[in-house]
Amino acid sequence: MNRKLCAPADRAQSWESIDWKKAEAYVKKLQMRIVKAQKDGHYNKVKTLQWLLTHSFYAKALAVKRVTSNKGKNTAGVDHELWKTPKGKFEAIEKLKRRGYKPQPLRRVYIPKKNGKLRPLSIPTMTDRAMQTLYKFALEPLAETLADPNS
């Protein structure tokens, strides 16, 4: 049996070819479906939609984009790994898998305060930050739905 392995047609093949508007729309749509399922009391559907979101290529791509474009993008964790190149960012998307994932220890840095003392700062690895962002995408709609409307 001679089979050809191909990537799905709608999935990007490189960092530069990712359609960011489509990715944001996909994640936003899944988040809205999570909110609707929560309001309707369909908790199994909420869980299923959260699973879909955390395993989707677009959500992983947005998580990596967010981590690599924020203020701490040049601060490495204990693994001293930074995702600066488009190739490195695309490989990071592929690495964001729950199976076998184990968070790394935090890198501890002490930064000076105004009074001369030092304040501890814990820095996670890029992979840990991206994984946190990915799961934030799935949990944030619930937090907003269940939060106090006056807060």
What does each model-identified segment do?
Residues 22, 30, 34-151:
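Conserved pre-catalytic core of RNA-dependent polymerases
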